[in-house]
């Protein structure tokens, strides 16, 4: 049962990843997802990095999986991620304010929910 769930999560992430990659040009992409665990994210990163588009490898600087429930309370309403651990990114309905980061493209949980 656990392996089946992991397989579903992997495919779910791959579909989301490639779907948004083709529309994000060469932006750094952040996927924020509440289903995915670290092992799955690592697989997705490897799959995307080994894929090709227009003859060039795709490199994603950041793929972050986050559960909104796992985020510290203070991170839920915005602010700067510079002071947060690497595995956290701020989620809100508005685009977060970034200072010392190079994040160009953010997919929020609510956006994924709407798309599904």
From Swiss-Prot:
It is a single-pass membrane protein. It is found in: Membrane. One of its GO terms (biological process) is ascospore formation. The chain crosses the membrane at residues 5-23. Keywords: Membrane, Transmembrane, Transmembrane helix. GO terms for cellular component: membrane. Partially overlaps DCS1. This is Putative uncharacterized protein YLR269C. It comes from Saccharomyces cerevisiae (strain ATCC 204508 / S288c) (Baker's yeast).
């Amino acid at each position: 049962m656990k392996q089946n769930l992991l397989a579903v999560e992997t495919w779910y992430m791959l579909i989301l990843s490639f779907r948004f990659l083709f529309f994000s040009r060469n932006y750094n992409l952040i996927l924020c997802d509440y289903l995915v665990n670290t092992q799955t994210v690592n697989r997705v990163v490897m799959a995307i990095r080994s894929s090709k588009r227009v003859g060039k490898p795709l490199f994603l600087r950041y793929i972050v999986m986050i559960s909104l429930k796992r985020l510290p309370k203070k991170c839920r309403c915005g602010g700067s991620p510079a002071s947060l651990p690497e595995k956290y990114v701020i989620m809100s309905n508005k685009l977060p304010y970034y200072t010392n980061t190079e994040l160009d493209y953010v997919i929020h949980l609510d956006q994924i929910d709407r798309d599904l």
